[in-house]
Structures are given as C-alpha cells and as structure tokens.
C-alpha cells in the first residue's frame, strides 16, 4: 500500500502544479466597464505598499500605477477588493492581474464607469 501511495503522490503534485488551484471566492459579484470585464475602468496610484497574502492578490509598492479592471461588490463585512495589474518598467508583477484592497489606491483617471454588475466565476479566483 505504501508503494502505491508513493507512486501516486508525485503524480498528484504534478497535476496540481500544472493546473493550479481554485481559491475561495472573495465575492459573488463584480462591477466592470463591460460584460466581459476586459476594458480598463481606471488608472490608480498606490498610496502604500501591500504584500499579497496569497496567489489571488498582487504585490504593490507605494507610488506604482495600477490598471483597474473590476471592482468586487462588498459582501457581509468582507474587505473591499479591486482587480488590476501593476503598470511600469521592469516590475515583477507587471501584466499579472490580481486583487488588492480598494483603500490602498487613489484613482487618478477614470476611463469608463464600472456600471455592469456581473457574477464572479471560479476562474476569477484561480491560482497557477
């Protein structure tokens, strides 16, 4: 039995590493500029550093610019989070979309209003 487990365990680890994991949902709805949440809502500036607690979030340094793509609808006393990606030259997080606390940033420029309320999906909280 132990041999079977030892043979099975590396395969399970490989599958998880290749496919990633689905994390808990932070909210059931989000606000977007369009139905598919692909258009940028705004450009925001980080007011302080933020270290991501897990793979759903992005690390942010004070002063970095962040493109905002969606805003989670706050539920039952949970934190208010937005999804976006860091903008800048040579940043490790550049191009990676993740969540960050709304109170961490100040919107500098609004491109489109976030008026479309859409349900979140499992892929919104997927980690590679």
Curated annotation (Swiss-Prot):
It is found in: Secreted. InterPro entries: OTOR, Otoraplin_SH3, SH3-like_dom_sf, SH3_domain. It holds the Pfam family SH3_2. CDD domains: MIAL (cd11891). The keyword Signal applies. One of its GO terms (biological process) is cartilage condensation. Highly expressed in cochlea. It comes from the Eukaryota. Residues 39-110 form the SH3 domain. Disulfide bonds join 32-37, 55-127. The keyword Aminoacyl-tRNA synthetase does not apply. Keywords: Disulfide bond, Secreted, SH3 domain, Signal. Residues 1-17 form the signal peptide. One of its GO terms (cellular component) is extracellular region. PANTHER family: OTORAPLIN (PTHR47146:SF1). Belongs to the MIA/OTOR family. This is Otoraplin. The gene is OTOR.
